[in-house]
């Protein structure tokens, strides 16, 4: 930046005192200070933006290289899998799709479907012994019905 020493700053202050005058000098100094602060913040923001764009460019290049490597790995896996399938079909002497159909031990199991947010599936999957042990109500009953059920019977005498 500009090389300002103590002597140059003193010279600038003396000239400003003579030109502007002692009454307006504090107001002008405040204005100059705020403008310099805004300029410094603007320069810092520009630096941050340039650094951010450089980092984004570097990240994009890294992303491209990683994607290229992933594509290479995928193609190599596909070629090796196709070579294996070809050698397997040559060794067994039949097509791979018919070989799986002919095997008697191959049983197709149903696919598990997670209940996600379905409350009925979640509660239905809980065992009854766990519900009984943890005190889960299995039969809904209104408050009035519950009071009537557990109210002591008046008028009936119990025989001992």
UniProtKB/Swiss-Prot annotation:
It is a single-pass membrane protein. GO terms for cellular component: TAT protein transport complex. Gene3D superfamilies: 1.20.5.3310. Residues 70-100, 133-160 are annotated as: Disordered. The Tat system comprises two distinct complexes: a TatABC complex, containing multiple copies of TatA, TatB and TatC subunits, and a separate TatA complex, containing only TatA subunits. Substrates initially bind to the TatABC complex, which probably triggers association of the separate TatA complex to form the active translocon. Part of the twin-arginine translocation (Tat) system that transports large folded proteins containing a characteristic twin-arginine motif in their signal peptide across membranes. Together with TatC, TatB is part of a receptor directly interacting with Tat signal peptides. TatB may form an oligomeric binding site that transiently accommodates folded Tat precursor proteins before their translocation. This is Sec-independent protein translocase protein TatB. It comes from Polaromonas sp. (strain JS666 / ATCC BAA-500). The lineage of its organism: Bacteria, Pseudomonadati, Pseudomonadota, Betaproteobacteria, Burkholderiales. The gene is tatB.
């Amino acid at each position: 930046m500009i090389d300002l020493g103590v002597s140059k700053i003193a010279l600038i202050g003396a000239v400003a005192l003579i030109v502007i005058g002692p009454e307006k000098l504090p107001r002008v100094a405040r204005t100059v200070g705020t403008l310099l602060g805004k300029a410094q913040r603007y320069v810092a923001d520009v630096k941050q933006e340039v650094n951010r764009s450089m980092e984004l460019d570097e990240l994009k290049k890294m992303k491209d290289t990683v994607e290229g490597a992933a594509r290479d790995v995928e193609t190599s896996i596909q070629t090796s899998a196709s070579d294996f399938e070809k050698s397997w079909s040559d060794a067994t002497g039949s097509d791979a799709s018919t070989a799986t159909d002919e095997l008697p031990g191959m049983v197709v199991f149903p696919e598990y479907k997670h209940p996600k947010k379905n409350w009925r599936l979640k509660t239905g999957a809980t065992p009854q012994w766990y519900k009984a042990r943890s005190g889960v109500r299995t039969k809904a009953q209104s408050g009035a019905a519950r009071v009537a059920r557990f109210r002591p019977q008046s008028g009936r005498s119990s025989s001992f």
